Structures are given as C-alpha cells and as structure tokens.
C-alpha cells in the first residue's frame, strides 16, 4: 500500500541518518522531501465547488496523515493550514519575485538534532497590461525544505541550476567553483565561500546521486547551505 511504502522509506531514511557525515546530509535532504511529496498535494487554484479528488485530499491531509505521523517517536507535526514565512524563503536567495504563497507545512524534530521543515510553495512575478489587468508569471512551484543542522557551519554554498532558471535566479556575489565532474557542471553552477569544503561536500558519489535523481525523476532542484541550514527547493509542481 501507499502507506506501507511510505513507512518503509521513512524508516530507511531515519536509519541512514545514524551514519551522517556533513556530506550525506545532502542525500537526506533529497530523501526526506521525496517521501513526503505524495502527501503535500493541495491545488493552488481552487474552484468554488470542490471536486471528489480535492475532498479526498483534504480529508487525507487533515485526518489520515496526522494519525499516521503520530506513530513515530520523532516529533512530527503536519499543519496543512500553516505556511513558511517569506523571510525564511528569502534567506536562501533563490530568486527575486513579486508574490509568494505557502501552505501545507510539515515539521520534524529528529532525535539526532536535525530539524526539518517543508512546505508547498509558489512564487510569481506580476505585470500589468495597458488595460490595467494584472498577470502572474510563475517562477517557482513545488516543495521548499529547510534542514537545521545541530553543528555550526559558517561557510556558504549555492547549488544553482546551470541553464534553465539562470535568468530568474539571484547570482551570488561569491566565487564560482569549478569541479572535476563535467557532467555535474552541465546540471549545476556551484558558488561557495570555501572551495576546499565544497570539494569535501560534493564528493563523486554525492554528485552522481544528484545527477541520477535529476534524470530519474525529471524534477529540477536547487540548494543553499548557509547559517547551519540547508535550504532546498524542488520544482515538482503539484504532486
């Protein structure tokens, strides 16, 4: 069943964090969001009359998910009507935008000291035509996650999409890092305040994992590491 698959994946992901290194927290960031994607599934644009699917999703989110999450020792809170404040999203310096929308918040306080917050999120630019009508141009639509690490990390690292979103992104005013993997650089641009630590974090295994995830899911993602937090966003749309 879907719930059974979710349970197995969640247990495996929690088991893997026992062996955390700083680098493997990247993998955890991907895993924790992937397993939650099917449960963050509310439409952005609602009609006045809810469809059967929307009613099912609403009941599933408000009743089934909270009961299921209560089975774990880790403190996990699912809040479908809460949102992540835009100031937190802005800390990641992903892009400039005009409008911001967030809902479906899930918080996890894990026993190893890592805290995870994720939300369904959307940003847009707005324009006004000659007739005074406002038009919304979508920049990001997907899942945004913050992972708070128990250890202090004072460096800054940005993992930005190489081409597709470059015109929309904020380009960091720090050094662009050149890596050994040409394949990886075809997917991402890396900016960091410390090239040595960047090489230690982005090992060949981690880079291969990111490429495989991108190719197998078709979901673009970007990441910021700063102030002992990992900010990661998945261009997943409505899952």
Feature annotation, model-predicted:
Residues 11-31:
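Hydrophobic alpha-helical transmembrane segments
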Residues 32-64:
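Transmembrane-cytosolic junction motif
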